[in-house]
Amino acid sequence: MASSTALSLSWSSSPCWSHSFNGGANETLKVSERRFNFEVVSQKKAKKLRKVILKEDVTDLGKQGQLLDVKAGFFRNFLLPTGKAQLMTPLLLKELKMEDERIEAEKQRVKEEAQQLAMVFQTVGAFKVKRKGGKGKLIFGSVTAQDLVDIIKSQLQKDIDKRLVSLPEIRETGEYIAELKLHPDVTARVKINVFAN
């Protein structure tokens, strides 16, 4: 049924259309019951796109390592001569997938280590901090994130960056809770008991 014969219609010679303009309410439009199958063929030029991977960040285009479809002329005249992109080949695509899998495995390993460290902090209980006492419950100075990091290092032999520690302001004796942001998905809560000497 897929014959590609061209069919041309002339409106004046076609018996299937009948229209009368009498200038009143009796205008009619008659169409015969025959159905025509038309095949429209366009002479539009197809856009030529190239799959490329960016070697560095390109303004208004993408980031390094991103896989994009760009126009062939843009790739040939700008991206290739400046060394900002490389044409995607099956071998390069395979290497890219392997690199993505390696990065994903590394992220998973880091997350698991953070979860294990959070479990260690839950089992330890409270860390004890002694400060010189003042009037009532007040202490001289305050307990800082660096103090907590030093205590964790001395008791658990774990190095924690002090920028990961979120502490309330501690200027009195009592029990406090600090949060350690070990990973974007893992937060550990640590109890701190502050005593006066």
UniProtKB/Swiss-Prot annotation:
- Transit peptide range per the UniProt entry: 1-42
Per UniProt, what is one GO molecular function of this protein?
structural constituent of ribosome
Q: Which UniProt keywords apply?
A: Chloroplast, Plastid, Ribonucleoprotein, Ribosomal protein, RNA-binding, rRNA-binding, Transit peptide
Does the keyword Protein biosynthesis feature in the UniProt annotation? no
Task: List locations, semicolon-separated.
Answer: Plastid, Chloroplast
Gene3D superfamilies xrefs: Ribosomal protein L9, C-terminal domain, Ribosomal protein L9, N-terminal domain
**Which GO BP terms apply?**
translation
Entry GO terms, CC: chloroplast; chloroplast envelope; chloroplast stroma; cytosol; plastid large ribosomal subunit
Q: Fetch the SUPFAM superfamilies from UniProt.
A: L9 N-domain-like, Ribosomal protein L9 C-domain
Q: Known Pfam families for this protein? A: Ribosomal_L9_C, Ribosomal_L9_N
Primary place of residence? plastid
The record's similarity note reads: Belongs to the bacterial ribosomal protein bL9 family.
Task of the protein? Binds to the 23S rRNA.
> What NCBIfam families does this protein map onto?
L9
Q: Kindly state the subunit structure of this protein.
A: Part of the 50S ribosomal subunit.
Q: What is this protein called?
A: Large ribosomal subunit protein bL9c
What species does this protein belong to? Arabidopsis thaliana
Q: Which gene encodes it?
A: RPL9
